[in-house]
């Protein structure tokens, strides 16, 4: 099952929507998640996908906190589960391989232009509480996916702290399921996106977003768009199909200097992942 997430920065030009359709076709996407798609343009995108796929694609639920919309192949049994979260929503996907439902959480967290890192750190426990409450209702905290724009790098405090996303870079650690801190048990997420950091990492780029400032501290490449997995899904992640997409049908999404080609496109790059479920 192929998933793709892209923060499209409210770009709904005809040319760009055609590129999204081409990307869906080229990468054989089953579940397409688009962030910052204006509500008034959802139907346009849905109709374009239906036309391209001969009515084999449809929209799932509404906008997640007015930020993210999901489209999926008719072959995928996916439905909204809880859309009451702030900046996050939950969906259920039926897995024939696992013979159970998998939870898909889609997130678009607060950005750093309007929210400080300290403020993000204060808000992230609310996301964690929402996830754990939904998992409790589902009766399963081992088969969850979180995907989206976290507006944070994998190494930031909110992403790694026990009271936050508790997302680790090492699959063997994540497979332990939980760890105890000061007498309280915390459940792990596995974050495979760590593997893209640096020139020696996976793929062609070190992040999904590029920003150059005149500040003394600047990373330039930021890995804001990520996927996290609970331990029950680790063996089903196809590492070879985890990618930051940099081309669509031969057209480069990067400039000659290696930064993101934002004109007519988006300031984020899309991410693709595959779960053999």
Locate the predicted segments by residue:
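Conserved acidic residues
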Residues: 30, 142-144, 149, 225
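N-terminal, active-site-proximal structural segment of metallo-dependent hydrolase catalytic domains
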Residues: 1-51, 55-60, 67-69, 262-277
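Catalytic metal-binding/acid-base residues of hydrolase active sites
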Residues: 9, 38, 110, 150-153
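Active-site flanking residues adjacent to catalytic metal/cofactor-binding acidic residues
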Residues: 6, 35, 107, 147-149
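Surface-exposed cleft-lining segments at the edges of enzyme active sites
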Residues: 109-124
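Metal-dependent phosphoester-hydrolase catalytic domains
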Residues: 137-139, 152-277
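Structured beta-strand-rich core segments of catalytic domains in phosphoester-bond hydrolases
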Residues: 33-112
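His/acidic metal-ligating clusters that form di-metal
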Residues: 126-147
